[in-house]
Amino acid sequence: MKTRNVAMMLSVALAASAARAVNYTWNSSSGGDLLDQTNYTPAGLPTASDTVTYNIDANYRLTASGDVPSHGPQTFSKGEIELDLGGHVWDAGSKYFYLNNPLLTLSSGMLTNLSQLVVSRTSPNARLVVTNGSTFKVSGQVVVGNDASSSHGGIVVADEGTTFSAVGGTVIGASGPFSALTVSDGARYSDANLTIGNVTTAVSNIVQVLNGSTVDTVSLEVKTHGNALIISNGSHVTASSAVNFAKAETCSSNRLEVWAGSTLHAGATKKPFAFGVGPDNVMLVDASSISVADTYFTLGADATGSGNRLDVRNGSSFHVDSWIACQGSFNEMHFSDPGTEIVSESQLLIGQPGVGNVVSIGNQASASVFGVSISYSAGSQSNVLEVADGARVDVNGKDLQIGVGGGASRLTIDGGSITNVLTVQMAAKRNVAGKDNNLLEIVNGGRLFANSTVYFGGVGNSNNVIRVAGAGSVLKNHDSYMSWASSSTNTVMYVEDAALVDIATTLAIGGAGGSGNAMIVSNATVKAGNAVSVNGVANLDIIGSGSSLTTSSDFTLTADATLRFVSDDEGFGKVVSGNRLNATEGAKLVIDGARVAKSGGGTFELLVGPELAKQYNTSNPLVNNVTLVPEDSELIVTRDAKQNIVNVSVRVPSKRSGIVVIVR
């Protein structure tokens, strides 16, 4: 019995010894067949429970005479090794590969079923190259730059037919800096998520997708600073979920570049595309496209994002299925060049919230958005939209808002156009409190076309300015009115230098309870399809002989309102009314002919219209409260047989100085 027990114990011990993992080492510096047991020390073929270390400091090639069965974990410590599997498959048996050697190249065949791939685990400069139509599959995670000392590690996936997949995702720069992933020359790379720069020590990493290559991932994140994603020469990157580029406040000086017919598509699962949470990040799209499906895009992703920049140029397209937002502080979006197109299925939001953000659309670029809002949120300040040099913005029948929630903001249309606007809201909607110091300017042939109402100023706010200047510059609404909000102060519209303001129905300058409001027309044209009124303490100035204001209905001055004509060297402009002149007691008429007097004087029509005779009369307060410059000018009021006024003119005496010639 005792002998039997000893025999059984010996049998169990031998079985356990046979099952114990063996630590193999590759021993051939000239390379060889992975299925040749003499290439290992101890001699034998590794199994799934064994480990293998490659630590010969030499250049050599590993081949396979057949499919390679599952090994245990593999560690490549030294040397430059080519893995040439031919048409065979190496099944890693759900074990890891660690690369600390300078170079491992898979040049043919398939390496599959890795649980994890770590490149530059504890040392710098390790690289993995997958090329020549081979296949590399990792069931877990791919990590490049595993600790803070493992810098300059990288993966290269190259050539048509070459594929690399990482089911557990990819981290380029897990802890170490200067890590890289390059996918080039028609290769394909896919993973669950792509992270560039994972912790604060992992900086200055780069992912390049070049020359017709493809990367498919679920989410894309950049978490540190100095990193880059470059997509170029007809390459394509798809992130089916969220894109968070420069994800934290510490993420600065990162770059996303899409070049030469390449594409970046994001957000198929309704996750946002957030770019530039931290400062000073740049996105450049050149002759390429970015599309964001079922979600929104933000530059300066919250109030902390500052100094970030987006440039879309040279015929590129930027298409977002939801809204586009430029927020945070001092962030900039620039869209330019013929063929460049911006499409948002929702609003373009500038400064919501934020300070000092700029969006410019120029040089014949085009945009289609469903509403524009500049400084919509409370606390937003000094945000800017510029549309210039033949650029076009179609607002698709939605509102254009400037300074509704925040102030000191600007919309400049400089030789560009904004069309198909529902309402224009400067500082606020009608009779709603708004903010101060906003500017709308339409210059150098710029055009703003609204379908409905144009509102200027908000209740109790002040110092908003509208300027329409230059030949070809037009502010027009098609079927409604333009008005100043009640009790707004110092809201001034300048119409200058051959510009046109064309209002479909009523024009109301100033509001009841307001003060300092004005419309100043200087050698330009204003048209109203219905009545014109000047309300509260407000001015209408008609400056220069090239100016005119025409209304097809009543022209009304309330108490304390002033109509002022100022001459140039040629004479005065005109107000042409299609119906009666209404003037409440206290309304004022000022006629300043100082300049035309110096050029010789003359007689000039000021108020004309075929139906004035119906309502003008000798007691009209306007013609009884007149200030004339020079004082010896003469107001000429022409009446019909019933003593109704039909014309108001002024005769200005000549104040031309004599010329003295001195002959020596």
What does each model-identified segment do?
Residues 53, 383, 434, 438, ...:
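Extracellular beta-strand/loop-rich repeat segments of large surface/secreted proteins
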Residues 18-101, 121, 570, 595-664:
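Solvent-exposed adhesion/ligand-recognition segments of exported proteins
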Residues 65-116, 134, 213, 218, ...:
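Extracellular, surface-exposed repeat architectures
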Residues 55, 84-86, 100, 107, ...:
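Feature marks extracellular polysaccharide-active and adherence modules
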Residues 79, 87-88, 102, 109-110, ...:
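Small-residue (G/S/T/A) turn/hinge positions that recur once per unit in extracellular repeat modules
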